[in-house]
Design a protein with these regions (language model features):
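Helix-start/capping segments and mature chain N-termini
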Residues: 1-76, 84-88, 113-314
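Short, glycine/charge-rich beta-strand/loop segments that flank catalytic centers
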Residues: 78-87, 97-112
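Active-site microenvironments in enzyme catalytic cores
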Residues: 48, 92, 101-105, 135
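Short secondary-structure junctions
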Residues: 91-98, 236
Length: 314
């Protein structure tokens, strides 16, 4: 019997691969001198598992490879080995529904005091946790309340937003601001007043029958891509475009998209003149619900599914 199937599975809370070993996620650690920690010199990606299968695993690995190349990160593990590790951490944890992360970190300098990135040994970490929803299911059911942060998103010219990263100072500030005002989560605009993204998700606006998602300042999300494909399948006009803040404030519907939760409807947006914008009778909108239902129905039918391999042992 595999460890993941025993009653006392030490990996039940999650499994990790770090420093070349598989360990319970609570035992995973890195050096406090790792530049991934001290300088956020790290890129990562997250893929989900549902029904014992990865969703769009190859697409996530492709994006992870692009991010590593842009950040000049080259861990020892090649793509084939990384794939094996991802399967193994899910299997060890015994999870059929999981949040699975892969990280490439700069590492610590081999030469004490060096400030040269090339003096660091890059390394790879992966872990699997029980399913995570960025927006809790009960909040999705009534529609999330979305706060437009008072700060600005880091400009594209300062850091490429298509590289998934942990430099979340601006996003976390907006999230705390949202919570201070009684909202569930937040989104930021850029210096030109265009809508960008939120902490861990892309945003979509439905206006006059068109489904729009920002062209700038945001990650090219895999769930975002999936939603655009679903719009085409349903015959819904959709576009990647600049979205002024005013369009968000006057939207017919708004929803969020992320690996950790899928399609997540919004029912309120604020602050706007007069307080807040309440959409769809303060409930998830018709288009949002239609896309959410189709997204999960296609999951159940095996859409872009890669079954978890439980025979990977190393």
């Amino acid at each position: 019997m595999d460890d993941s199937q025993t009653p006392a599975n030490p990996y039940a809370a999650g499994a990790a691969y770090v420093q070349g070993r598989f360990v319970p996620v609570g035992q995973a650690s890195i050096s406090v001198l790792d530049w991934g920690f001290t300088r956020s010199d790290v890129t990562y990606d997250v893929v989900h598992v549902t029904g014992d299968a990865f969703f769009r695993l190859d697409d996530h690995l492709d994006r992870f490879a692009r991010s590593m190349a842009k950040r000049r990160l080259a861990p020892a593990e090649d793509r084939a080995r990384m794939t094996e590790i991802l399967h193994r951490v899910v299997s060890l944890a015994g999870l059929r529904e999981a949040y699975v992360a892969m990280l490439a970190l700069r590492g610590r300098p081999r030469i004490g005091g060096s400030r040269r990135p090339v003096d660091c040994d890059n390394h790879f970490i992966a872990y699997a946790l029980p399913w995570i929803d960025v927006v809790p299911p009960e909040v999705q059911a009534r529609g999330a309340h979305l706060w437009i942060g008072s700060g600005e998103r880091v400009p594209d010219a300062a850091f490429d937003p298509t590289v998934k990263n942990y430099m979340w100072g601006d996003l976390n500030s907006s999230l705390m601001e949202a919570h201070d005002h009684g909202y569930d989560t937040s989104v930021l605009c850029d210096g030109q007043g265009r809508v960008t993204e939120g902490p861990g998700f892309n945003i979509f606006v439905v206006k006059d029958g068109r489904v729009l998602t920002p062209a700038h300042g945001s990650l090219q999300g895999i769930t975002r891509r999936s939603v655009l494909e679903l719009c085409e399948e349903l015959g819904l006009p959709c576009a990647v475009a600049d979205i002024p803040r005013a369009t968000l404030e006057d939207a017919d519907e708004v929803f969020l998209a992320t690996t950790a939760g899928g399609v997540m409807p919004v029912s309120r947006v604020g602050p706007v003149a007069g307080g807040q914008r309440i959409m769809g009778n303060d409930r998830p909108g018709v288009v949002s619900v239609r896309l959410k239902e189709l997204y999960w129905a296609k999951h159940r039918a095996g859409w872009y599914a890669t079954p978890v391999r439980h025979d990977v042992m190393a």
